[in-house]
């Protein structure tokens, strides 16, 4: 039974622990008082302004609905614009076979982060070990890249 029950050690309260308890009690009382005053003020303001909300509800409800619709419309327009810019850049790349001018990429990065062309691959890091005195063989020359064939022009409308 001695293992399950631990003996409580009695000790005398020090001045520091008594002072800490008194200050903590005062702080908790002050915070509780501030909380009560805040709750009472909120309830009083709610009671005082409720008639105004009832009287002006024919104006406030449509204004809230209009604000919501305007916000939704602006968000939809922004999304459609960003999508249009992305599609135009994709068409430009497909038609010309080259990247769009850097100005468009900068604008696109501001509109849609991460949607602009991916950066070119960085060169590989140098090996950690010291290089050999002389390479065993010379690296093979890279074949010249052939230009991409241009697609046929779309028919005129």
Swiss-Prot record:
Residues 137-157 are annotated as: Disordered. GO terms for biological process: post-embryonic development; reproductive structure development. Residues 2-20 are annotated as: Polar. Pfam families: Oleosin (PF01277). Its main location: other. InterPro entries: Oleosin. Belongs to the oleosin family. PANTHER family: OLEOSIN. Many of the major pollen coat proteins are derived from endoproteolytic cleavage of oleosin-like proteins. This is Oleosin-B1. It comes from Brassica napus (Rape).
